[in-house]
Amino acid sequence: MKVRIALPRRLARALGRLYGALHATLRLEGLLPDGSRVTPSTYPFGREIFAFCERDAFALGGILGRARFTTLIAPGRDGDWATEVVTSLGGRVLRGATRRGGTRALAQLLRDLPGDDGPLALVVDGPLGPSGVAKGGAVVCAARTGRPLRPVGAAGRRAPVVGRSWSRLWLPLPFSRVVVVVGEPLPVPPALDRPGRERLAGELTRRLAEARRRALAEVDA
């Protein structure tokens, strides 16, 4: 039994190293709200919350690996592998999702974040979709921490979709150009009722779609 557990972990760590090597070949370009352009090495990472869709996770993981980031990963076998990969990139992982323990994981996240100066990266449409539709967890986190909540979208030229996942997860090709659009922070008040949370989740969904459209237009230009 120990061998069966250890082997996948070694493979996942190796995958993390390959993942980092892939990102080293990419031509990564960040597009900010004011139209200015940055590279991952010049982006001023801080105490912000990056909200993105699962489809962009492969494209963004290596970029976030340049910062000391924290993320939330759903339970399950896929989550186990993802945890090993994120850890190999230098990220900190808490396990949980919007279902089955997500409330507890979010509470732990909120307890741990005050002394953490690194960014928080949250997949907002998981664990089961629909793709591109934000849940309310990131909004709650922004309300309780006061951190800026930034919608992020990415696109790559001729990028293949991995498997048949609900999320349409895509993988950047080696040496390809990848554009990452970082949107304006979504204003989130510290006190939110359920209708307010749902309204802001809807606005976040709209902004994520806009970031995705901008990234696609830029990469195809």
Named regions from a protein language model:
Residues 135-193:
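A cross-family acyltransferase "interaction/gating" segment
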